[in-house]
Curated annotation (Swiss-Prot):
<keyword id="KW-0997">Cell inner membrane</keyword>
<dbReference type="GO" id="GO:0046933">
    <property type="term" value="F:proton-transporting ATP synthase activity, rotational mechanism"/>
</dbReference>
<dbReference type="InterPro" id="IPR026015">
    <property type="entry name" value="ATP_synth_OSCP/delta_N_sf"/>
</dbReference>
<dbReference type="Pfam" id="PF00213">
    <property type="entry name" value="OSCP"/>
</dbReference>
<keyword id="KW-0375">Hydrogen ion transport</keyword>
<keyword id="KW-0472">Membrane</keyword>
<comment type="similarity">
    <text>Belongs to the ATPase delta chain family.</text>
</comment>
<protein>
    <recommendedName>
        <fullName>ATP synthase subunit delta</fullName>
    </recommendedName>
</protein>
<dbReference type="InterPro" id="IPR020781">
    <property type="entry name" value="ATPase_OSCP/d_CS"/>
</dbReference>
<keyword id="KW-0813">Transport</keyword>
<keyword id="KW-0139">CF(1)</keyword>
<comment type="function">
    <text>F(1)F(0) ATP synthase produces ATP from ADP in the presence of a proton or sodium gradient. F-type ATPases consist of two structural domains, F(1) containing the extramembraneous catalytic core and F(0) containing the membrane proton channel, linked together by a central stalk and a peripheral stalk. During catalysis, ATP synthesis in the catalytic domain of F(1) is coupled via a rotary mechanism of the central stalk subunits to proton translocation.</text>
</comment>
<keyword id="KW-1003">Cell membrane</keyword>
<dbReference type="GO" id="GO:0045259">
    <property type="term" value="C:proton-transporting ATP synthase complex"/>
</dbReference>
<comment type="function">
    <text>This protein is part of the stalk that links CF(0) to CF(1). It either transmits conformational changes from CF(0) to CF(1) or is implicated in proton conduction.</text>
</comment>
<keyword id="KW-0066">ATP synthesis</keyword>
<dbReference type="GO" id="GO:0005886">
    <property type="term" value="C:plasma membrane"/>
</dbReference>
Amino acid sequence: MSEFVTVARPYAKAAFDFAVEHQAVERWQNMLAFTAQVTRNEQIAELLSGAVAPETMSTTFIAVCGDQLDEPAQNFIRVMAENGRLLVLPEVLQQFIQLRASLESTVDVEVSSARALNDEQLAKIAAAMEKRLSRKVKLNCKIDKSVMAGVVIRAGDMVIDGSVRGRLERLADVLQS
């Protein structure tokens, strides 16, 4: 089964990259779910594990799927059939779903400041962090008097210290060395 994971990874990544590029992630996930279900059919599974020519296999598989597959998805199936990989479609679907989840996930960003920030400041911070992290962000604001002025932003293990206190500490370190 771990072999299926390794084999499916590049196919899932290619399908996902194509879907994102063409803004069709939902449609591709649905098509992959349908094809994964088709491979679970006993008769189709026998056909796929038999010694059938790749062209015949892909033609039959696409015919079974009918109009559920658009042209790029049919090409994807042909490539997988040429390489004898149609049986890993369920794993391709699982990895596609994981890639989609990581793309659409949000990052919790903690913003500490000496005083409450206004909506415009929060919007600028959110936009900058979304650009930097390439993800949607959810700001959690807290007031911390020790910051003095400026902000300290934490996202996972990344810390951006734009506070006066942080600047003074860095200046003190430079002067002591």
